[in-house]
């Protein structure tokens, strides 16, 4: 463990050298992840997806089986059993959801988001940000503060009210929790909020656009969503199909900006909207498909993490 590492180093080398706590933890995590990758054996499985429809809906419902099937034989047997099965809505839940915008950019969150959204490396992000800063387009790009100046907050409020209307505005104060954070600096934001676009290289324009949208979104209203989950029973079988959909009642900050995540695999499914459904309603099967997949080895830690 990292706790014992420092004294050993200290004894063997010289009193001035210490393995930094954060560094030791990072090294241990990387070593453990490498072991996991080395010992990993990919396992085959089958993922089953069905398209079904109700009598009165033109749009099909995409539903996924709630378990993975371990082999081709199991998948074939399951598909065969679905040919003449009856499908019905066994459970239906509708939950209201609220999403709030993320805080303004710090150096590390800008690096992570530029990596995910724009495919930039850490050094590329910093190089482009440096040019934007030197051209007077953004505030200083090395900061761990999420604060915005009162001047910036006033301008953002004006911008939202003018372009989108008052219902999209919500005043928010963000506070830096990191110990020893440089509170003297602001978060990374456009120098002039009224400048929606800038002249410059394609990379500079893209990074500026990301910073501008994120900054505006920080002072916007929550997005109000509705998440519907439908469980579909398969006559005579224990397995169930599950269909999920998210409906946007009020887009709020999503009108301007959606934060990325490292796992984007669920995005396509979560964006689908389900037709009006009722518990007990029967469905007709349009299409069913079993896809061979393999379990994925754990990813290595990326530079931005």
List each model region and its residues.
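Polybasic, glycine- and aromatic-enriched phosphate-binding surface used to engage nucleic acids
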Residues: 239-271, 277-279
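Generic alpha-helical secondary structure signal
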Residues: 14, 44, 49-50, 109, ...
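Phosphate-backbone binding and catalysis cores of DNA-processing enzymes
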Residues: 1-96, 186-251
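Structured DNA-binding interfaces in DNA transaction proteins
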Residues: 76-209, 218-219, 227, 263-305
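N-terminal low-complexity, intrinsically disordered patches enriched in charged
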Residues: 67, 71-73, 254-256, 261, ...
């Amino acid at each position: 463990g990292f706790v014992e590492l420092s004294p050993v180093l200290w004894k063997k080398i010289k009193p001035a050298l210490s393995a930094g706590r954060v560094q030791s933890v990072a090294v241990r995590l990387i070593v453990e992840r490498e072991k996991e990758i080395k010992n990993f054996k990919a396992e085959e499985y089958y993922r089953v997806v069905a398209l079904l429809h109700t009598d009165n809906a033109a749009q099909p419902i995409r539903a996924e089986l709630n378990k993975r099937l371990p082999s081709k034989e199991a998948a074939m047997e399951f598909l065969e059993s679905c040919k003449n099965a009856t499908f019905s809505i066994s459970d239906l839940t509708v939950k209201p959801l609220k999403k709030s915008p993320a805080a303004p950019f710090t150096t590390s969150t800008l690096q992570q988001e530029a990596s995910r959204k724009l495919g930039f490396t850490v050094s590329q992000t910093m190089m482009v940000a440096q040019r934007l800063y030197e051209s007077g387009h953004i505030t200083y790009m090395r900061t761990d503060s999420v604060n915005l100046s009162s001047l910036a907050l006033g301008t953002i409020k004006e911008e939202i009210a003018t372009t989108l209307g008052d219902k999209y505005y919500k005043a928010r104060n963000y506070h830096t929790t990191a110990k020893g954070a440089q509170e003297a600096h602001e978060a990374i934001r456009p120098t002039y909020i009224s400048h929606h676009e800038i002249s410059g290289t394609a990379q500079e324009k893209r990074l500026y656009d990301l910073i501008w949208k994120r900054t505006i979104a920080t002072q916007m209203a929550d997005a109000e969503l509705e998440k519907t989950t439908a469980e579909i029973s398969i006559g005579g079988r224990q397995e169930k199909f599950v269909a999920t959909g998210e409906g946007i009642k009020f887009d709020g900050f999503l009108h301007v900006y959606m934060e990325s995540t490292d796992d984007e695999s669920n995005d396509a499914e979560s964006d689908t909207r389900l037709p009006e459904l009722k518990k007990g309603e029967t469905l007709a099967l349009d299409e069913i498909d079993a896809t061979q997949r393999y379990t994925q080895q754990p990813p290595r830690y990326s530079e931005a993490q």
